[in-house]
Structure formats: structure tokens, C-alpha cells
């Protein structure tokens, strides 16, 4: 797939621009292109394309990332798609891309102090952009509710509070059947509405109990460890970058949803 990197990256940028013109808005972000039968989210394509492009460029640099020129060259390829995703605005997807890029810089041997500065800069950016309009009200609510779920358990903190109750109700072996009886084939939950979205782990804890949650986390651990092994065994820089980028993506996604 290395030979298609430029085309893949360029195409993803075109799609990110296109979605700002003709895209439809879902959950406050204009990030989807309606193709009739299915909908396409260009940001998902851009995440993989960006990691591929950075891997290709890092390979051309022979892995030498600790120069000002090389550092900012790689950064440009990450900033372009990130900026287009921020405009949608989709801060969640931007965060995912950030951690994937951070993984590439890490595997590239970037000075660890620079990585720490990058994390600090991200936190500072959130503070500075808090009232800029780029961070939507619902995103602010999710952040504040996560930090203190007991602030408003009837509104902003409701889902998080209910998810904890649901997990606790599962006990060791689980509480009740996993699927609803309304003919939709959807998940059932006595405590969390729309549990199949960001609170799927609460569903596992409620339906399958502690044992089910442990099994799921064990599978995640095996998946991540295998992906890291693949990254270590990659014969070129491009392969390592793509592999570790995907490790970063899965790790962040798993952490975010648990």
C-alpha cells in the first residue's frame, strides 16, 4: 500500500474540503457525505492516510526526526487534515488523530521532552479554545460531566452516572439478557439509554458482569500486544509508523469508551 500513499493522502484532503461544502451535520459536526445507500466520513479515511504519509516521509528522512526541518515537515502533513477536521468542528476526531500522530513521533525516536511539551500544549489549547466556539457546548458538557459526574445527575451527568449503576448491577456474572425484546435486535439496558453508543462498556458490565468485562479487557490487551509486536517486527520505518499509529488509535478509542 506504500505506493498509493500520496494518492490516498491527497484524496482524503479533497474529501475533507468537500465535506465542508456538501456534508451533512451529525451531532454538531458537518463531517458526513451522504452517498444515498451509505454515508462516508472523510475524517476516518484521513486518519489512516495521515499516518501513512508521515510514515513515508519519515522513511525518506531515514528516521531522523530530531531536526527542526524534519519535525515541522511531518507536522505540516498532520496539521492540514487536523485543521480541516477542527473546522467541521469535530474535536473528538481531532483528538484521535493527535494521539495517532503522537504515536508516530514516539516510534520515530522524538525526544521525550518534546512529546511532553506537545501534551502540555494540547491541554493549554483546550483551555484557550474553551470559549472560542470551536469546542461545542455538548463537548464541554461531556468533559465537565466526566470530571464530576455528580454535578447534575438528571441532565449532563445522567448517562455517566447511570453507566456506573449499570456496571455495578451486573455483579460478577451479569444481570439479564443481552438483547431487547422489541423486535429491533438492539441492546437492552435497564439503566442506560442508547447504550450501544459511547457507553457500550456499561452494557458489557451490566449484561455479562465482572467476568465479562475482564474477558473483554483481556481480548483488548491481546489485540494491543499483538499490534505492538507487529510494529516491532516491521522491516521498514513505514510499516512501523502505520502499525504504531493504529495501536495509538485503538488504545485511545478503547480508553475513551471505557
Language-model region placement:
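Long extracytoplasmic/lumenal interhelical loops at the membrane interface
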Residues: 172-208
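Extracytosolic (periplasmic/ER-lumenal) interhelical loops and adjacent juxtamembrane/interface segments
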Residues: 159-176
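Membrane-helix/interface signature in polytopic inner-membrane proteins
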Residues: 167, 181-182, 229
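Hydrophobic alpha-helical transmembrane segments of multi-pass inner membrane proteins, especially
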Residues: 1-161, 202-258
